[in-house]
Amino acid sequence: MKDLLGLMGKAKEMQAKFQAMQDEIATVESVGQAGGGLVSVILSGKFEMKSLKIDPSLFKEDEVEILEDLILAAHNDAKAKVEQIMQEKTKALTSGLPIPPGMKLPF
């Protein structure tokens, strides 16, 4: 019974830590760039786009597809950075816990 109560206490503690981590990640902003900085995107930790900057030299009718590709690449770059931050924080929080590799935690 003592072990069960201890386990339940640890579960509540972990839940509180995960919530704090999620709150912290929500405040993170990540910058993604493409085209050597011609396009940049800022994403929040919740993957909301906060900013999009495009160099005016890209506003040419015959370069629309290039611009579209650069916007997508910048967004994906920022998204990958946010995901990396989330992974690092989750790993630090769960170190020492018997969690199977590759298990996605509730985010």
Curated annotation (Swiss-Prot):
Subcellular location, principal: cytoplasm
Biological function: Binds to DNA and alters its conformation. May be involved in regulation of gene expression, nucleoid organization and DNA protection.
Family: Belongs to the YbaB/EbfC family.
Subunit structure: Homodimer.
A Pfam family this chain is assigned to: YbaB_DNA_bd
Keywords: Cytoplasm, DNA-binding
Domain of life: Bacteria
UniProt keyword Cytoplasm, yes or no: yes
Protein's name according to its UniProt entry: Nucleoid-associated protein mlr5504
NCBIfam families linked to this entry: DNA_YbaB_EbfC
GO cellular component: bacterial nucleoid; cytosol
Localization (cell): Cytoplasm, Nucleoid
MF annotations from Gene Ontology: DNA binding
